[in-house]
């Protein structure tokens, strides 16, 4: 867990998380979070989903591996006047009793835990009968993946991350314990320029920050140029940049 903690403690993740707002809203709305629901936000990050669930009256707990992110989540909750419990911990080994949550949610978070079987077992264990489950998972981005492969042999997000973007894998992991539904989605990343997107990712996306730390100055600049060139291909007629990122939305109900 120490390596993951180091990776996810870097950068200003809250800036990137702000771009996920439409998906965060979608998740909370589809899960029907309401007053009194006991909600667990897995890999809560800087707390965006947790705060939205609390606004709806949920009794919310968020857990994350990175204390710097949790500190920002606590600040955000305090600004909102939201009473949220934030715990430092590993989503593969949750420090909670059996069947103690009505809603389990994760927005592009729990998918980064490497042991999928452990994650699935823990989701089932802490969910009460009839509990609602909702999480989002990135689908492969072939062009971006090819770019990163020019700088590292290993996928920067981890080899297993995109498995969660496959319906058959989710069924294999969770189908025994949850009735599952799936919905494809696209998140549009918009900016005035490709350079603006580079600044966002190089300062706020922990896997990209970790990759940059592994490269010397010349290779970092090479990655910078390649990244900007890629996103320049998403120029719109009005001169801005609008790039799609596909994801899978998973909804479930505990059997």
Task: Spell out what each predicted region is.
Residues 1-37, 48-52, 69-72, 132-156, ...:
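Conserved class I S-adenosyl-L-methionine
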Residues 92-103:
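A short acidic, Gly/Pro-enriched loop at the edge of an enzyme's catalytic core
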Residues 31-33, 54, 127, 174:
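A generic alpha-to-beta junction signature in SAM-dependent methyltransferases
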Residues 103-116:
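A short SAM/SAH-binding and catalytic strip from SAM-dependent methyltransferases
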Residues 19-20, 46, 162-255:
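Conserved Class I S-adenosyl-L-methionine
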Residues 38-93, 118:
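Class I SAM-dependent methyltransferase SAM/SAH-binding core
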Residues 117-132:
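A short glycine-rich, Lys/Arg-flanked "PGG" loop and its adjoining helix->strand segment in the class I
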